[in-house]
Design a protein with these regions (language model features):
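Membrane-proximal helix-turn-helix segments that form the acceptor-binding/catalytic region
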Residues: 127, 139-186
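Acidic anion/phosphate-binding donor-loop and adjacent secondary structure
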Residues: 198, 207-231
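Nucleotide-activated donor-binding/catalytic signature segment of Leloir-type glycosyltransferases, i.e.
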Residues: 272-292, 296
Length: 396
């Protein structure tokens, strides 16, 4: 099979979960004997992302603000304009491929891709109905469904006119996205994401949609295998809004067991502030590390914590901890409860209702050794286990 993966996130040296998923899946398809290319950005060095196949650097669509911040409202024309241009670019490169698989940030692009094109897209976040892709505002999860409420994310005091214009933009975006999902195959990385979109567009036709989770490369993870270090707690991710690092440290720093050592791996706009307030003999912020270094730290952890206060769709960080057999603590939000099915042993993934309850759960987990498990047993989110599901969907 000839597959063209498409993503605006590639190439990139610091890949998030979406970019890692695309590269992992594309390399697995290559290993299985398929012909794979990635259509990505013109800028950047393709070699740094780890893809072993042909890279087509053609996406040059910058995403300027279009003065939305200055105007205090969302522009109804902006996102459809970008989607049309990306669809035209896809059309220019789709010839000769059996599947064109888009992983990106413009879910409405499928509404502009010809019905005859074998187009599939994967939705990795809440950007199907939320223009900031996160559904998180004012330090809390946003459950608003009325498009007028979205004006509050682009300006602090939108007023009736700005609310109306923003609502036009959001409603149009959601309608075109629903049209894209009805027109072409769509993968959601969790059932949570599928349900979320249905809440925003109850009449959406999702009969062609399927849930296929994010994946990890089990062979690569096993190569980093190490014994857990007693008391070592590892947190990894971008230190940004919604990821919960600040809330976790605020709740935990004064209550750490004496033997506990916390390593926080990652960069982002919040790192400097966290380092100023919380760095100590027990708390280390390493900054960004490459993937293999981060996985090696995870393998040495006695406990992994994913403190996201936003609703994660399908946390690759949680999957990596589970794959390595490490106990993992997270909040019971978003798609994370769906990951219980990937536990190596009962109780491996513990879900807390609040940050205070999550912190309470640390000490008992640190007091117990990491349970033994069969590292050779198949892991359900290993790319080699998931690949047949993807190929079946391609062929459907």
């Amino acid at each position: 099979m000839k597959v063209l993966m498409v993503s605006e996130d590639l190439p990139g040296a610091q890949l998030g979960g979406l970019g890692k998923h695309v590269v992992t899946m594309a390399n697995a398809l290559l290993d299985a004997g398929h012909e794979v290319a990635i259509l990505g950005r013109k800028a950047g060095d393709p070699a740094v992302c780890g893809f072993r196949g042909r890279f087509i650097g053609a996406i040059a669509l910058a995403h300027p603000n279009w003065k939305e911040s200055q105007l205090g409202c969302y522009n109804p024309v902006k996102r459809p304009w970008f989607a049309r241009h990306l669809a035209a670019l896809i059309a220019r490169h789709a010839s000769g491929f059996d599947v064109v698989h888009y992983h990106g940030h413009l879910p409405l692009v499928g509404a502009y891709v010809d019905r005859a094109c074998p187009f599939v897209q994967t939705r990795h976040d809440q950007g199907s109905d939320c223009l900031v892709h996160l559904r998180f505002r004012g330090g809390a999860v946003c459950d608003a469904l009325d498009a007028r409420a979205c004006a509050g994310c682009i300006g602090p005091a939108p007023g009736l006119l700005r609310q109306h214009v923003s609502a036009m933009a959001v409603d149009g975006y959601r309608d075109r996205t629903a049209a894209a999902f009805a027109r072409h195959k769509t993968i959601f990385v969790s059932d949570f994401l599928r349900r979320r979109f249905q809440q925003a567009r109850p009449g959406a036709n999702l009969r062609r949609a399927r849930v296929i989770p994010n994946v990890v490369d089990m062979a690569r993870l096993q190569a980093a295998g190490s014994a857990p270090e007693p008391g070592h707690i590892v947190l990894a991710g971008r230190i940004d809004t919604g990821k919960g690092f600040e809330q976790f440290l605020a709740a935990a720093h004064a209550r750490l067991p004496r033997q506990a050592r916390i390593t926080i791996v990652g960069d982002g706009p919040g790192r400097a502030g966290l380092a100023r307030h919380y760095a100590s003999d027990q708390i280390t912020l390493t900054g960004w590390r490459d993937y293999d270094s981060t996985v090696a730290l995870t393998a040495r952890a006695q406990l992994c914590i994913v403190p996201s206060v936003c609703e994660e769709a399908c946390s690759t960080t949680v999957l990596e901890a589970l794959a390595l057999g490490r106990p993992c603590l997270a909040l019971a939000r978003g798609g994370t409860p769906e990951l219980l099915r990937y536990q190596r042993y009962p109780g491996q993934l513990q879900l807390a209702p609040t940050m205070a309850a999550l912190v309470d759960a640390m000490a008992p987990l640190l007091a117990a050794p990491v349970p033994a498990f069969d590292a050779r047993a198949p892991f359900g989110a290993d790319v080699r286990q998931v690949l047949p599901q993807l190929l079946d969907y391609y062929a459907a």
